[in-house]
Every structure is written in C-alpha cells, then in structure tokens.
A protein has these predicted regions:
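Hydrophobic alpha-helical membrane-interfacial segments at the cytosolic entry of transmembrane helices
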Residues: 109-133, 207, 252-265
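Perimembrane helix-loop-helix junctions
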Residues: 92-123, 244-247
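Specific aromatic-rich, kink-prone transmembrane helix
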Residues: 10-13, 49-66, 71-79, 98-104, ...
Length: 381
C-alpha cells in the first residue's frame, strides 16, 4: 500500500530527525508498517484519518524540533485532508495541536512561522472551495451532511466513553501506556526540576505524543469497530528510546526492554488481530472453509472468500450472490443497489446510485424521526 509506505517513511523520517540511530529508526518503522494498515483488509475512514492525523503530529513536532517554517505550512493542509477523510479523531487531535501551538507562539512569537501556517490554511481552503464549486456542491449541504449530522451522532457516542474505569482506559491499552512511560517520566522529572520546562519545545512534543494517544484511546472507545490503534506502540517506544538515551544513559537494559516490548506486542497483535482478522470480526471463523473468491468473479482472483454470515458454508453465500448479481445485471433500468456487498457495482462495472456508503443503524444516515431526516430525504427526492 502506498499510504502504508508514506506512513512508515514518515515515522522513520521523524525519528531520524531526533537523531535516533538509523537501524532503530528502521526497526520501529517496520513494526509500524506491520501493525498499521494490515489490521483491516480494506482500511476504513477511521484508519486513514488516524494515520493522517499522526502524520500531522509528526509535522507539528518536527516544526518545533527543526525550527523550519515549511512544517507549519504543511500542518494545516495535512489536518484538512485528514478531516475530510473522517471528522474523528482528526478533530480531537487538531484541538490538541491548536492548544500547544498557542502556548508555543505565546513564548516564541515568530511572524514568519505564523505566516507560513496561514498560507497553508488559505491554500487548503481555496482548493476545498474550488472542489465544491466544480462539483456543484452547496456549502450548506457539506455543513449538513459532514458537520451537523456527524455531530448529532457524536452526542450518542459520548456515552460509550463511560464509565471512565481504570480497566477500560488503562488495562485494556496497557502496552500502549507502557511504551509511553519513559516520556511521562521525563516530562514529570523535568517539570519538577524547573516549572519553566512547561513552555519548553520538548515538553510540547511529549504532550503532543501522549495527548494524541489518549485522543485515539477515546476515539477507539467511541467507535463500534475493532481495535486498530496498537500501531502507536512502536511509535511511542521509538520516542521513548530517543528521550531515554538523552536523559538516562547509564541503564541500557531499558532500551532492550523497549525493543522487547515492541517486538512482543507486534507479534501478539499481529497474530491475534491481523492474522485472525479480528477487526473484521473474523477471529472465530475457520479460514480452512474459505473458498477462492474468483468463483464469484474473476475480478476477485487471488482472494479468499468467507464471511461471518456463512462461516460454515461460504459456497451457499456465493451462489446466492451470483443469483442476485445476474438479476441486477439483466435489469437495464437506472437503479439504486442497497447492499452491504459494496463490490457488486465493481463486478458489474456500473454505478449503483447508492445514497449511503453503509447501511447500518444509528450512525450511517439519519433515520426516520431524526432531526436531519427531512433534509436527508429531500436531498434524494
């Protein structure tokens, strides 16, 4: 995957800019590549927006680390693309960066850096508005469909955060917290030595890393998808490695523990979540029952077919799908295909005119009785 490569190379580049040995940069980046995109066969919007948001975090901390204006230019552009991919967790991580940026510029005012950030923002806004204009998309439709309705969904999702139990927030994600422990120790130690460290670039960098981690944990608790944020372990371990070498040079066994933590967690989650397709709810499915997907269509050649609907008899599901596809193919009228089998239109090489990407309750589209249902219905009628 090109995007997995970009995310991996961004991790490598960022760690390398912190003067971590190239071999370790490669090591941690490789583990990120294993845990990131492979967690789902087809990455969801949650994946894409999360990885873009973390790249934006890299951009922010590199802006502080290198003092280069170019990173302030790209920061709003990356965040903008991430937000248009999916609103959350981009929104939460964006607020963290805005908060830290305000602190940074209060104590390190630099008109040149601010100007570069404004230019990047204006370029993104201009391109965005141009796309709306070319696509004849009213700004009001964008606000209703992409901002207001998702916010109404988010109101219900906030309930998923509670109760705020130690088990749910810390024990469930204990390896993520362990990988960031050195960062937390460094921050507390330096603040105790001198409270002015709170405005230091290094503290802002550590805060950005830990803050974005908690934002991802909160996001993970609010969504109904499988866990996918364990790619943060090698990233946090890599930065822990950087700051451990800087402040604790005498006890090298901690470095070995970080490496062991990264390898063991990658092996565990790679097997339990990626190999077993836990994200797709296939962890209890016997893959020996899977059939060659090209039986359904040659475009699926090279893939194996099995789902949670027919785990013991995938052939029956394929036969039903073939029957349905033949009926749809013989109907020459313009039609809307309402189905969770989103690849049908690809097989038929036709547009399905579906009003929704997903057909799930509560979160995919406004249902009857929802305050935005009339807007949703009138859009298509």
């Amino acid at each position: 995957s090109i995007f997995n490569f970009l995310f991996t190379i961004s991790t490598f580049y960022t760690l390398h800019k912190f003067k971590l040995d190239t071999r370790y940069c490669f090591f941690y980046s490789l583990l990120v590549a294993i845990l990131a995109y492979p967690s789902a066969g087809t990455p969801y919007g949650d994946h894409q927006s999360t990885y873009l948001s973390i790249i934006a975090i890299f951009c922010f901390i590199l802006a502080l680390r290198t003092n280069l204006r170019i990173f302030w230019f790209f920061l709003p552009i990356i965040f903008g693309i991430a937000f248009l991919t999916k609103q959350a967790p981009t929104g939460q991580i964006f607020l963290i960066v805005v908060f830290l940026s305000i602190i940074y510029f209060i104590f390190n005012f630099n008109l040149g850096k601010i100007t570069f950030g404004i230019i990047g923002s204006l370029i993104f806004i201009f391109i965005f508005l141009a796309i709306l204009k070319i696509g004849k998309i009213p700004l009001s439709s964008f606000l209703e469909q992409y901002i207001l309705f998702p916010l109404s969904v988010g109101e219900n999702r906030l309930e998923f955060l509670f109760p705020l139990e130690f088990k749910r927030i810390f024990l469930r994600f204990k390896l993520i917290h362990l990988s960031s422990l050195i960062l937390l120790i460094v921050a507390i130690k330096k603040v105790k030595e001198n409270y002015k460290y709170l405005k230091h670039d290094e503290f802002l960098i550590i805060f950005a890393l830990i803050g974005s981690t908690f934002a991802l944990i909160a996001h993970q608790l609010m969504i109904i998808n499988g866990i996918f944020i364990f790619f943060m372990i090698p990233i946090l371990a890599g930065f822990s490695h950087v700051y451990y070498l800087k402040y604790f040079k005498n006890k090298n066994y901690i470095v070995y523990l970080l490496i062991f933590l990264s390898i063991s967690s990658t092996a565990y989650y790679g097997y339990e979540y990626i190999n077993k397709r836990n994200f797709m709810d296939l962890n209890k499915v016997n893959f020996k029952n899977a059939l060659d997907a090209k039986i359904l269509d040659k475009k699926l050649s090279g893939l194996k077919w099995i789902t949670t609907l027919y785990p013991n008899n995938p052939k029956k599901e394929i036969l039903k799908l073939q029957e349905a596809i033949n009926i749809i193919n013989k109907d020459n009228r313009n039609k809307t295909i309402a189905t969770d089998y989103q690849f049908i239109s690809v097989i038929l090489s036709s547009y399905d005119y579906s009003p929704n990407k997903y057909w799930g309750e509560y979160h995919a589209y406004p249902e009857k009785g929802h305050k935005y249902f009339e807007i949703y219905r009138n859009f298509f009628i």
